[in-house]
Every structure is written in structure tokens, then in C-alpha cells.
From Swiss-Prot:
Family: Belongs to the succinate/malate CoA ligase beta subunit family.
Gene (name only): sucC
Name this protein carries in UniProt: Succinate--CoA ligase [ADP-forming] subunit beta
Keyword Ligase: yes
Anything else known: Succinyl-CoA synthetase (SCS) of E.coli catalyzes its reaction via three steps that involve phosphoryl enzyme and enzyme-bound succinyl phosphate as intermediates.
Subunit structure: Heterotetramer of two alpha and two beta subunits.
Gene Ontology terms, MF aspect: ATP binding; magnesium ion binding; succinate-CoA ligase (ADP-forming) activity; succinate-CoA ligase (GDP-forming) activity
Gene3D superfamilies from the UniProt entry: ATP-grasp fold, A domain (3.30.1490.20), ATP-grasp fold, B domain (3.30.470.20), Succinyl-CoA synthetase domains (3.40.50.261)
HAMAP family attached to this UniProt entry: Succ_CoA_beta
Provenance organism: Escherichia coli (strain K12)
Cellular compartments per GO CC: cytoplasm; cytosol; succinate-CoA ligase complex; succinate-CoA ligase complex (ADP-forming)
Domain ATP-grasp: from-to ranges: 9-244
Activity control mechanisms: Exhibits two interesting properties: 'substrate synergism', in which the enzyme is most active for the catalysis of its partial reactions only when all the substrate-binding sites are occupied, and 'catalytic cooperativity' between alternating active sites in the tetramer, whereby the interaction of substrates (particularly ATP) at one site is needed to promote catalysis at the other.
Effect seen on changing residue 197 to Q: Prevents phosphorylation of the enzyme intermediate by ATP
Length: 388
């Protein structure tokens, strides 16, 4: 679950990290009033969406008058911002962040993620702030400096100083950087985050560090113990199908293809998408119904898949280990009957009660294509989309 920039900066403030004074506004009038609260300009106005690349898309602007603030707010509030990180429809702009402009001398980068290979929280810092860190990693990886947090000791001040020295910081900037490093690490661990990023972390012309931007991603599996973060969730920034799936504890990610996939198990789901592409198809989604699939959840999964107008066929690939294939069959039959499916449905069942599940599908009288294996299933669903 991602947070908006203004929400990230609210958290920064709670932990004593320096950030520009700013206010999130939902109307042009509020935006003008925010400028008055901040004081004399110039100001920076920013569209609040869950996507990077806002500046290049016109969603960030330095303004010198309240009239310009009103014009910016009137232009963007209620509209959709399209960036390189969004789809063609973009993300809705419901808030504008108005904050004091900062005199920038140098831009840095500081962020942290959970590194799966080392099984540690890893901090990354770079002198190349203000650009996508992925681009820096690809083109100039030697400019990214890393430290891993020991899960027993947690963050240590010497690690912050080590990064500061590698960035070429001196004097009071080393102390300020170390404080920010320790604060970010504390936020990351206490708030069950998956990602935290300040890009850019700037050195002002007055010689101080300030968090000019903020990006936070919370671990969705830990939200049950982070009620205040859960309340910050902005579902308008999410695919409505993904939000609906989350309510049923389904793992759903929308993609750009036309073959809907319903699978139990994340690994099998990825393998299913791979074999569909291998045979010339394009998956419309990733959907994992999980090991505890019920008839109701399978029915809901079917509804979510078919709510995508791009879907021209559905592939159901179930391995019955924990889940029983006959229950999955009941869910498929119920969903097809309830929703009124008008696209081909290819089903591959293996494992626990697979034969009983296949018999139920055959006896249902519905237009469901039974596959004899995974390769056969992929070939049949691709052929169905192509009208063969």
C-alpha cells in the first residue's frame, strides 16, 4: 500500500525529520489559504498521485503568486495525471500539496527496501538525487552506496556516518544526514514498510539537509497492526478490481493482455502467465486465489476477471494440494451460471479430487473446455482467443 507525498511528510514530521512546511488542499481556495499560512513565496505546488514522473508531466510547478496557485489547482483538481509510471488513463488528482519553495544547492538520494537476497533491510544512498534510482542503478551502479541493517542491533549511527562520508558530506551535514538515516530506519521498522525513499534529499543554499520529497510503501500483510496507516489508504489511486480482490483476500494485479488467469499459488500463477506468453497469448491479470480457496472466493475471482472488458477468454489452472478441485469446480460452475460468461473458459485441474472436479464440470452442461495438462490448457486458451 502506497502513501501520498504529503502523508509521508506527515510521518517524517512525527519522527523529527526536516521537511518543507506544506498543506494538502482539495480546493483552489484551500490552496490559496495554504500559501497565506506558509508566508511569502515562491511556493511549490504538487499533484498528489501514487506515481513518479509528476514533474515531467506538468504535475509539479514553482509559482510566485496566489493567482498561479489557484490556476494550477483549478487546472488539476478532479483531473487525471498521466506519467510514465501510470497507464494511459493516469491517476486521479484529488489533492494539491502547497509548500514553501526550497533553495537547492545539491540533490541527493536516500532510500531503503527489503532485500530478498540478503534478507535484510538495505539502505541506498547516492549523489545522483532527483532522477529515477533505477536509471542510476542501470547506468552508473558505482554511484549507489549501500548498508544493510542487522536485524538484531537495528540501525546504528556509524552506518549513517559511513554513507555520509561516501556521499562527500562534511561538518554538520554528516550529523544531519545521520539523524535522517536513523529516523528513516526507525520509521521503516516501526511502521512495517516495504519501501521508503527521499528523492531528492537536498542540501539547501543555507547548508542544511531537507527532505524535499517522500515516498512510502507499506507491507500490506502487516496493515492489521498499523491502523493509522490503514486509514491513510487512498483507494482512488488503486485499480478498483485490485481493491475488490483485496476485500476477498485475493491477490490480483491487472495487466494489459486479453486472457484472464485464475490460479492457486503465486508460483503457479507466474508459471501460468509464462506458458500463456510462450504460446503467443497475453495475460490480462495475475490472480492467486490462495491455498484456502472457497466456492465464494472463486466465484468472486471470476467476477473480477470478467469485469475487465479486455478479457476474451479465461484460463483456470488449479493444483489441488490444500484446496479441493471439486470445490473449485463448484465455484467455477456457480460463477459461470451467475455472471453469464460469454467468453471461452479453459480449465485445468490436477491433484486433490481432480477427477471429481472434472466430472462436475462435464456434467454441468456449460461451455467449459477441459484441458489435459498445462501445455494443452495454454494452447487451447490461446486458440480460443484467436477464434480457432
Amino acid at each position: 500500500m502506497n502513501l501520498h507525498e504529503y502523508q509521508a511528510k506527515q510521518l517524517f514530521a512525527r519522527y523529527g525529520l526536516p521537511a518543507p512546511v506544506g498543506y494538502a488542499c482539495t480546493t483552489p481556495r484551500e490552496a490559496e489559504e495554504a500559501a497565506s499560512k506558509i508566508g511569502a513565496g515562491p511556493w511549490v505546488v504538487k499533484c498528489q498521485v501514487h506515481a513518479g514522473g509528476r514533474g515531467k508531466a506538468g504535475g509539479v510547478k514553482v509559482v510566485n503568486s496566489k493567482e498561479d496557485i489557484r490556476a494550477f489547482a483549478e487546472n488539476w483538481l478532479g483531473k487525471r495525471l498521466v506519467t510514465y509510471q501510470t497507464d494511459a488513463n493516469g491517476q486521479p488528482v484529488n489533492q494539491i500539496l502547497v509548500e514553501a519553495a526550497t533553495d537547492i544547492a545539491k540533490e541527493l538520494y536516500l532510500g531503503a527496501v527489503v532485500d530478498r537476497s540478503s534478507r535484510r533491510v538495505v539502505f541506498m544512498a547516492s549523489t545522483e538525487g532527483g532522477v529515477e534510482i533505477e536509471k542510476v542503478a542501470e547506468e552508473t551502479p558505482h554511484l549507489i552506496h549501500k548498508v544493510a541493517l542487522d536485524p538484531l542491533t537495528g540501525p546504528m549511527p556509524y552506518q549513517g556516518r559511513e554513507l555520509a562520508f561516501k556521499l562527500g558530506l562534511e561538518g554538520k551535514l554528516v550529523q544531519q544526514f545521520t539523524k535522517i538515516f536513523m529516523g528513516l530506519a526507525t520509521i521503516f521498522l516501526e511502521r512495517d514498510l516495504a519501501l521508503i525513499e527521499i528523492n531528492p534529499l537536498v542540501i539547501t543554499k543555507q547548508g542544511d539537509l531537507i527532505c524535499l520529497d517522500g515516498k512510502l510503501g507499506a507491507d500490506g500483510n502487516a496493515l492489521f497492526r498499523q491502523p493509522d496507516l490503514r486509514e491513510m489508504r487512498d483507494q482512488s489511486q488503486e485499480d478498483p478490481r485490485e481493491a475488490q480482490a483485496a476485500q476477498w483476500e485475493l491477490n490480483y494485479v491487472a495487466l494489459d493482455g486479453n486472457i484472464g488467469c485464475m490460479v492457486n499459488g503465486a508460483g503457479l500463477a507466474m508459471g501460468t502467465m509464462d506458458i500463456v506468453k510462450l504460446h503467443g497469448g497475453e495475460p490480462a491479470n495475475f490472480l492467486d486465489v490462495g491455498g484456502g480457496a472457497t466456492k465464494e472466493r472463486v466465484t468472486e475471482a471470476f467476477k473480477i476477471i470478467l469485469s475487465d472488458d479486455k478479457v476474451k477468454a479465461v484460463l483456470v489452472n488449479i493444483f489441488g494440494g490444500i484446496v479441493r478441485c471439486d470445490l473449485i469446480a463448484d465455484g467455477i460452475i456457480g460463477a459461470v451460471a451467475e455472471v453469464g460468461v460469454n467468453v471461452p473458459v479453459v480449465v485445468r485441474l490436477e491433484g486433490n479430487n481432480a477427477e471429481l472436479g472434472a466430472k462436475k464440470l462435464a456434467d454441468s452442461g456449460l461451455n467449459i473446455i477441459a484441458a489435459k495438462g498445462l501445455t494443452d490448457a495454454a494452447q487451447q486458451v490461446v486458440a480460443a482467443v484467436e477464434g480457432k
